[in-house]
Amino acid sequence: MQHETWLLLFKSLNSGKFPGYVRFKTQAARIHDTTLAERLGFDKDEALSLGKAVAGLNAQSKGRRLGIFKPVPQEVKKARARKRGEEFLIEICGRQVPAINTTDGVRAVNKNQPIEAKSVERYLESKFGETLGSARAAMRDLAKAFRPEQLLKNAFSLYEEFRPAIPEGVKGWGAKGNLDIDRIRSLALEK
């Protein structure tokens, strides 16, 4: 099994004063900056696929912590991992994401199926509408303010600088937050 280290600052767009509300983590986390992924070597479609996988993994972890989801027994996890043919792991923000090379490039895997970029893109467009472009542009500016190795080291702390305030615990599960594009841009300027 090959292991590659890679970072997606997918969570970074989930914050502040965004005109369209988005659900914390699962929706906004998917709207990661594809230019960051390209800067680190992955193309836009690869980044969309991997970002969706990480958002799902993080949502599952939070759900387990809150008692909403029950953990899967270790034996089942191992069995599922063995069924996946030529997969490898990609580390994204400290998470091990199963991935596979397809004819279209690297794709994250969910339930033994590659996550297709087009479906993730449609989802993001449906949630963010015409503001998707400006959110990506702000993240592009933020990503350009750092060298890739700095992003690998500081991705989550950057996210913490502008993540939305939502209720803790079960009350915050699925809560909506705002995206403050100006705050994201200011972080790039502060750098």
List each language-model region with its residue ranges.
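Solvent-exposed interaction surfaces and binding hotspots enriched for charged
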Residues: Q2-K191
